[in-house]
Amino acid sequence: MQDIQLDKRLSELLSQAVTPHNAQPIMQALCQSLNEHNIRYYVDDAPSITDSEYDRLMQRLKQLEAEYPQFVAADSPTQRVGGMALAKFEQITHLKPMLSLDNAFDEADFSAFHKRVSDRVGEVSFCCEPKLDGLAVSILYRNGVLERAATRGDGTVGEDITENVKTIKSIPLKLRGDNYPELVEVRGEAFMPKAAFEALNERARLKDEKLFVNPRNAAAGSLRQLDSKITASRALSFYAYALGVVEPTSHELAKTHYEQLQQLKSWGLPVSSEIKVCDELSQVFAYYQDILTRRADLPFEIDGVVMKVNDIAQQQTLGFVAKSPRWAIAYKFPAQEEMTLLEGVDFQVGRTGAVTPVARLKPVFVGGVTVSNATLHNADEIARLGVMVGDTVIIRRAGDVIPQIVAIVPERRPEDAKAIAFPQHCPVCGSLVERLEGEAVARCSGGLFCEAQRKEAIKHFASRKALDIDGMGDKIVEQLIDKELVQSPADLFKLTASMMTMLDRMGIKSATNLALAIEAAKTTTLPRFLYALGIREVGETTAANLATHFGSLEALRVATIEQLIQVEDIGEVVAQHVAHFFAQPHNLEVIDALIAAGVNWPAIAAPSADEQPLKGQTWVLTGTLNQLNRNDAKAQLQALGAKVAGSVSKNTDCLVAGEAAGSKLAKAQELGVKVIGEDELLALLAANS
């Protein structure tokens, strides 16, 4: 093995005869060397040994691991081949939400974003990077060792894909060096390079198997395999693009986004070589045009570029909106377009009641797929386009995912073209379709009655924060509706144990317990009942405010928009939603049926000032509470008049910090917000009980 270019220590170890006494240090040295060569190859782009030399080292390690399996290390490169297949993916709650980005589609959009940012924080530089078309991934390292990995999911909860991520050769199983934090979350994009995608489809073609449409679908499908051996065979890659949670928070990190990416690279994580800092708006546009021009020649698929405010302090000042950071934007590339014929328009009703026009198209191949349907969004979009049935239209796959009509070809309009009439009544249930002033989306107002909304309405009605029917999970609701045992929330209270034994995996004992839970749920509170009705934009707090203000369901049912606007935190839009909901006869019939079935609640007495000592205050909960669950603590604080928010700001009056409190505690301390522990909270609640 004298031809292998190794460090002196490894050379000395490999020259020894292997025994049970020295096998472990030899294997550790091999792991360390192979992992370092992986980083040099995938991260530094500067390999120091040949592929054949690497293969010989790997083969030697495999031989030793076969002889001494008790010494196999968790970070051994041999562990990337995949393990036992899973039955399903476990759910993981992200330590910090994985937010999505707002989009810019042209220079005007980005200029507006730039103005919003610079108006708030002054001059800014941007860290610009290609927007990889793959799957967002969170990877958690503890003491430098890869502990877990998860998909983005809905941003709050993702799927545990740890074993699959370990098969990606460019992701280190152990970080390089020793200057990393005790706990560090790395966020990035898992993707399939174009060459790997072509090879994968070629193998499928030879086996007469179904081909993947594009590299993104291939990457997503590969990463979500229950059998990690399949993932290991798919040649996925990864680029890190951000830090997530870092603990301890006192660990010194770079002050700019670009420098933080270089820190990630120094720890052995791959970072795109196309990243660049731009100080001027003109440089940003030049970067965009450069990447767009070279798009086809890049080794991976991209659908735009991402621009992030480079200064971390400015990022923190800008903060976040509900689902995205204010300091970053995805500047999307123009999607591919084709012309085809609009043959008709159908109207679909979604689970939330949104009535959406769907274009039926003469099938056309665009953006890598055959498209026969496209969204027309809403009535405003139909009017803006001036589109009619029979028109020749231009189809674009917006964001390379959702086909949409972007224009018509007027000169090709036939004489018999027909105008598109938006329905006045729901095509599913016949209820009035409402469209409030200032809103683009039209909605069916028969929320409790409409078949299209039925499953979601009843799931919500039975949920923990609504009627709280213990044991009535989503799967049971779906079965009840599919078997036509339930058609409205009131039908839940007609169910008997014997009826529910018809459900899958529902024995008489479980059915009896569920019947008892349904009976118990009849006694509730007016705020819970109002929340359970699923009125648009009426959450727990708004439901409580409505109940407190009007005192009874009877008074609320006949309230005018003017009266509703007088309720705390209710504006004209929410007032219109409430008024329209109670104006629908179908909804009133369901409410009357619920009351006739025995649903009841105690009368509400208006709280005195003494009973609401926290009125006007904003509180935030963070960390783990041992004696109260989060919802109970929230409800009790609200009963004392507090508004319970989800994030800390300068308007926060008090933060309750449980165990393992993280970024919210740090933010509160930074802003000088009062912080109390669980014991102090319990004392406060006891004193006001």
From Swiss-Prot:
Entry's Gene Ontology cellular component terms: cytosol
Membrane-spanning ranges: none
Alphabetized UniProt keyword annotations: DNA damage, DNA repair, DNA replication, Ligase, Magnesium, Manganese, Metal-binding, NAD, Zinc
PROSITE patterns: BRCT (PS50172), DNA_LIGASE_N1 (PS01055), DNA_LIGASE_N2 (PS01056)
Pfam families assigned to the protein according to its UniProt record, in alphabetical order: BRCT (PF00533), DNA_ligase_aden (PF01653), DNA_ligase_OB (PF03120), DNA_ligase_ZBD (PF03119), HHH_2 (PF12826), HHH_5 (PF14520)
Family statement: Belongs to the NAD-dependent DNA ligase family. LigA subfamily.
Protein name: DNA ligase
Organism: Shewanella sp. (strain ANA-3)
Designated gene of the protein: ligA
